[in-house]
Amino acid sequence: MMKAPVIEIFSSFQGEGLLIGERQIFVRFAGCNLNCTYCDTNDSKSAESGKLMTPQQVSDEINKLLTPDCRTISFTGGEPSLYPDFISEVSKNFDLKIMLETNGTLPDNIDLIDKLDIVSHKD
């Protein structure tokens, strides 16, 4: 059964980028392929810091948080592109925009994600 390490799932307003100010559901993965000194989510660098969850468990948590003003699910991390099949599996359960907040270093993995509307990366 497919599982991925998840730090947290929460609803909040996007604080940066094109969708600033919009309510989103955030799925924060654990694990990153880099070790940036300026990282603002140090607790998510190691995959061991997350709770292993199935796509259905994540989808259930997202459903609990959905409100009428929420139109986007943002997958963040750590590095969410480490889990392309998992993101594809969760995304197919929702008719919402799918955003990936990524370091951009795994373009082949990003291409594997079936339904992506927005890719936001840090240079």
Language-model segments: which ranges?
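Non-cysteine beta-strand/loop elements that form the S-adenosyl-L-methionine
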Residues: 115-123
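Short beta-strand segments
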Residues: 28, 76, 120
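Conserved Radical SAM active-site core
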Residues: 4-8, 23-24, 38-114
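N-terminal pre-triad scaffold of radical SAM enzymes
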Residues: 2-38
